[in-house]
Amino acid sequence: MDPIIQTIQLFQHTLHHDANVIKAAEAQLQQIKVTDGYSRILLKILASNEVDISIRQGVSIFLKNMIITKWRGAEDESPITQEDAEFIKENLIDLLVHSHHLVQNQIEAMIEIIANRDFPEKWTSLLPKSIQYINTQDVKLILAGLTSIQLGIKRFRYVTMGDKKKELLYTIVNEIFPLLLQILEFLSQHQTIESALMQKKVIKIFGYAIHFEIPDLLIQPEVFNKWLSQFVRIIQRPITPQENVKHADDCRKNQWWLLKRTTAKLLNLLFRKSATSVRSTDHSSVKALNKLFMPVYSVEVMKVFYEQLSTLEQLYKGVHYERYQQKLIEYFSFAIKYGVTYVAMKPWLSTLIQQVLFPIICFNDRDAELWECDPNEFLRSQFESSMTFATARIEVLNFIIDVVGKRGRANLDMIMGFCIQSLNKYNAATNASEKNPREKDGVLVIISVLSAYLKNISFYKSNLEQMLLLHVFPELSSPHGFLKARACSLFSEFYNIEFTDPVYFSNALKLILGLMSDNDLPVRVKAGTSICNLVRANQGVDELRPILPQLLDKIFSLLSEAESEDLVIAIESIIQRFKHEIAPYAVNLCKNLSEQFLRLLELEESDESGESGFASQECLGVYCTLLRALKDIPDVFNSLEQQIVPILQKLFTSDHMMYLDEALRILTFVTYYPKSISPLVWSLFPQIMNLFDECACDFASSYVNPLDNYISYGTEYFLSNQQYIEMVFNMYKKMVGDINQQPVDAGDCCKIMESLIQRAKGRIDYMIVPVLELACGRLLNTDKNNQKSKEFTVYLLEIIANCIYYNPLISTQYLESKNLVEPIFGLWFNRIKHFQRFYDKKISVLAFSSLLTLNPSPNFVKFGTSLILEKMLQFTKDMLSIEKELDKQEAEREQKIKDGTLKPEEEEFIDENDEEDYFDNHKFEFEFTEIPDNQDCQHDDEGEVFLDDIEKATEYFENGGDLGEDEGDNFDDQNDDDDQDSEEDLFEDEDTPDFETPIDEVDGFEFMINSIQNFFQINPTCIQQISEKQQEKIKKYVASAPARKEKLRLEKEKEEKLKQQQQKK
């Protein structure tokens, strides 16, 4: 059979209704696609207009996937042959000209993939053929030529300065950009859709060419001026009624609007590139662009954009492309930062804000349509819930925030003067027809985004109460739903101001509670989400306490209507605020939470927007907040587990990895607060361990706490199950035994193994040698691929320390039998300054002390007595200093409690992740940093550093650099100078764990004194090895031991009494 006909038939079968026929056809296609010349057959089918379009669509996707996986540079056992590759490259652009529009996107994707790997060196025909097509009078040929150049140049947009590939780009720019400029000038006379599309492609080519660095040709003043004239011409050209669409939503498909938006985006890019602070290391073209664009062009473009914004609404009657409008406004947000543009802007700044930008943020017809037809979408489109979306409204609010934050108090006063005038005008109107509720909504939005300034500047702060009473609280009863919703949000924004009469707050709170049953969903949701802040206030507690169960039920009811993460946060705030009263409602609350989470999870699996994903994540956070609130009531946990464990069982699967961190956090609380592990919670252990082995190695840090709890609070059950012990060891082996595993993750597994060794003292002798073998092997491995860090080195050495403390005889026998004593202890002593935490020092002291208890003493201990004692005494000194500092801090804390300046455990009221103090009344006075109008604002240092980092990283990789940690740190070298990083603080990025371990109950000081005395009784001659200074230090410590023992006893008694008092409470 003819291979073309056979292939067409196979693709017909892939569209069959019978799954077996489809499967057989797909299998056969997979077999024959490796045949030499098969890609030519597919290309011929695509070129034939006689073949059904559905077949050609399938073929285009199939060929594109072949090119992705089999083209030069891809890892495939049967790549496309050189002959086939040349045939494809020779005919692909021609195919773009003549193919059906339904397959053109796939053909363009093929051109881009090939160009990215071959152009220009190995696809030398792309540029000449494209230029040939562009020079014709055929629209299809010109479009194909421009498209091919666009896709070819696109590969250079992320090539950094100094890269040799840039030279290739400069050559291409010099050859084709004069032609492209001519085309742009020629197309200005043609008013067709094809003309708009071709101009857009030219603009995109220009954008790709200057993305990282502008070529020298384009920075020549005469050339640059010609290009900029064309850009401005495109922006200024009006779109006729015939060219425009009938509905604003269709603008995103209109080529004329897309052309304008693409050009505005390019001009923003030019402004950013030219305005960026010029550094001495910058390429000459960057400096040239700055000198060329900023003094004149930046202002001229801004004026053009201002004219566009001013007339956009009037000219197009609301039917315009919002993304284009957003790009116009974005330019002004940049212009604020620079003196030359801000000085030019300032004379008409108030007009820009009040007459041009303000209407954009007011409630409009589009909002009204969403309010009625899709209230959930209305909620998503609002500023409070859509910070990540690029809309004209968001851009205006960003501009207002920046013009105040970067250019000072005068602008705040100007904007607030406008707002106050508008509010007073609204209130003064006696006739409802004279009031404009939509404008008032816009004013309240501005006040909301400027709230941080208003709450921290005395003049405004002193008037906030009056503003709320006159202009906000009345709208809680407004006939306009959108104003009621806005009033809820604004009241919650100013929840913590001090009212002269508490009744004002109470009355407003009652109105908001009532609005949670309003007829309009957005009002109900905004009323519910405002509770998040209102429960934090000093006022209103008495009103909320009696209705807690009804309030929670109402918010859960709202959650079933709207997937709002803010509603979930409101529940979390209620739990935090009323944690002592929440226990009676805990089980029902947990049940509702579980139902909502499962509903949101189901929505997320079918929701491409990801909105429900945020809300479901917040639900898991509420579990944690609830469990923390109930930590002193362990009896309730058994009931809560019935609701929580089924949720965790669902989440501890490979399909729900995005929830794994939070799920393990919940498991941490469930295994920690009850101080015992129920059979139901134990059922999760094999599941989380199997998940780790399958795909969760990157989550090792999240595993540390729950596994430590399992081992610590379920020790007997854990040790009775050999399979569980093996699972923990295999986890340790998987991460420590593989030199390619990241040090951070492997270090976390060391912590888990430490927990097991300490809890199972005397019961897992058989594991000590394998554990030591893995730790020593990773420590001393000199392979350049061995992933290592200073912190990880400490963790591995602490594994060895734990093994020695567990059983010094087994450990030393292994080390001696493998000749590891010298390299391990040499490394240990050489890295002694890396043992910076109290725990690091204590476990080392316990390990060294354990060596001294052996009888007979190993030779290396006897010969190294002086060195071992030196390290022990140094660590002991450090530990005593830390203890002294902690005692001082505790004494200061107790004094503050005694003085009444600190309440016991008051810090527990606030969530550890809460960014704002619950009772922050904004008592500090905000002061602006005033910058002269003609000066640039201070540049973002982080952004500058980021640019530097890009350049350094690029240079590093170009020079063949390797990003391995601690590069060149040879563990075999015992004489390296450790002083060079002695001041380096390690473990800074780690949360200090509050593990309860058996060694907490061991006094390292007493253990050390006893072991030293024991050692010298066994080896009296060894005392001659130690210095007089060491002997004096030991005597001093021995003499102080009784007093220290009594001090610890009294502290223990005090601790027990405090614990008993807390239990009584």
UniProtKB/Swiss-Prot annotation:
Residues 963-996 have a biased composition (Acidic residues). It comes from the Eukaryota. Residues 958-996 are annotated as: Disordered. Keywords: Cytoplasm, Nucleus, Protein transport, Transport. Disulfide bonds: none annotated. InterPro entries: ARM-like, ARM-type_fold, Importin-beta_N, XPO2_central. Coiled coil: none annotated. Its main location: cytoplasm. Residues 25-98 form the Importin N-terminal domain. SMART domains: IBN_N. GO terms for biological process: protein import into nucleus. GO terms for molecular function: small GTPase binding. It is found in: Cytoplasm; Nucleus. GO terms for cellular component: cytosol; nuclear envelope. Belongs to the importin beta family. May function in nuclear protein import. This is Probable importin-7 homolog. It comes from Dictyostelium discoideum.
